Design a protein with these regions (language model features):
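Extracytoplasmic/lumenal domain signature
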Residues: 1-234
Length: 234
């Protein structure tokens, strides 16, 4: 129907669509504008250049705030009406990796060194240090648990979002893990690019199954159908 062009050929970051149909696209380049709000008809609503490339998927709150995390490990809260910066916060770490919002409006941000929880007004609620969240990753939220995929065989970590304590970790064998999703029974699925493996882990951290595939799983996510079929892009 339409094509929206940015200022140069580069890597795209995460994108999402608001309730009014506005598309928010982040870009992994700091030399150009790297956050775009695009109207449903393909015209630009606004654009903005933040302090670093954006590999992490953004998150959108119910009250119209877009949260973006750059590879300078700076978390931004942007007004979706015009792209104005409501607030920003520098985090520990050399890479910004993932952002999510829960039903209470709390924001979770993961970097190469920690996972943080903030209120909508920038108050830090807790910080879990010593976790290296995979760049270009996402979080999965289920009840009071946040699931994050980690780099360098660290696998999957489950975090209690009420206090920031680590519930458990599920280590892997091959490399960086990506894109956790949770089914209605609480089973968590994620991929790992080093060993080309798909994992299913129960809510208590125990193995459900592990499947090695013969295709490249670099940056590969998954989708789960209502009838229990897991689809994986390679």
């Amino acid at each position: 129907k339409w094509v929206f062009a940015i200022d140069k050929i580069t890597y795209g970051g995460g994108a999402l669509v608001g309730s009014d149909g506005t598309i928010y696209q982040c870009v992994r380049d700091a030399s150009i504008k790297n956050v775009y709000a695009i109207n449903p008809n393909g015209t630009q609503k606004w654009s903005l250049q933040l302090d670093g490339p954006i590999g992490a998927f953004p998150a959108l709150s119910a009250d119209g705030v877009l949260y973006c995390l750059t590879n300078k490990s700076t978390l931004y809260a942007l007004d979706v009406a015009n792209g104005a910066i409501k607030w920003q916060q520098s985090l520990d770490g050399t890479t910004g990796s993932a952002v999510a919002i829960d039903r209470n409006g709390h924001i979770y941000a993961g970097t190469s060194e920690a996972i943080y929880a903030f209120s909508a007004n920038k108050e830090e609620l807790w910080k879990l240090s010593g976790v290296n969240v995979t760049e270009q990753g996402t979080f999965a939220l289920n009840g009071n648990t946040l699931y994050a995929t980690l780099k360098s065989k660290a696998g999957l970590v489950a975090v209690d979002i009420t206090n920031g304590t680590k519930k458990w970790t599920y280590p892997t064998t091959g490399g960086d893990a990506y894109f956790p999703i949770v089914d209605k029974k609480g089973v968590v699925y994620f991929t790992e690019k080093g060993s080309q493996t798909v994992y299913a882990v129960d809510a208590d951290g125990s193995k459900v199954w592990v499947k090695k595939v013969n295709n490249n799983l670099n940056y590969s996510g998954a989708a789960l159908s209502t009838d229990g079929v897991l689809y994986i892009g390679t």
